[in-house]
């Protein structure tokens, strides 16, 4: 996002110096990273997931590479269903829902979350990636009943206990949304 070019362009233009604006931005990013341990993905505002670039900010969890395995499993299992209906509970940035919608073009994918801020990021990613078959809704799965039945329910729910929160690295506990990490038990 700093250079506004592809990875290949970086290699091809490796010897090209940064202009004063780029250098200033880079210095501010380095300060944020070194001084605060702020995750690079939040500093740049994006991350890669399943080969695609997704917008992220401190309102959504940074997608983990391990989560890509969930995508692989659903893709593998969905082969037996002509038009699968899939729900992603706690969709956050929408990376799981949007990826499934793009990888399984005949699927209808629904992403739900209790955070309107997260849903804004999910919608932004949907629009930028031009995903037509994913739909995002504000919903608390513990209170509200989903509107239909689904062939697949996928989720990367909060899984860190309140006691474990203190043991997390500074860049996780100080920057990632606690609502996405813990159920506060």
Language-model features, listed with the residues they occupy:
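Conserved SAM/SAH cofactor-binding pocket of Class I
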Residues: 66-167
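Conserved beta-strand termini and adjacent loop/short-helix elements that scaffold enzyme active sites
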Residues: 45, 57, 137-139, 184
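Proline-centered helix-kink/hinge sites
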Residues: 39, 63, 157-158, 177
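Conserved beta-strand segments that form the floor/walls of ligand-binding pockets within enzyme
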Residues: 55, 99, 113, 173, ...
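Conserved AdoMet
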Residues: 2-76
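Cytosolic-biased juxtamembrane loops and peripheral soluble domains of multi-pass membrane proteins
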Residues: 46, 51, 114, 168-174
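Mobile active-site "lid"/loop adjacent to the S-adenosyl-L-methionine
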Residues: 159-185
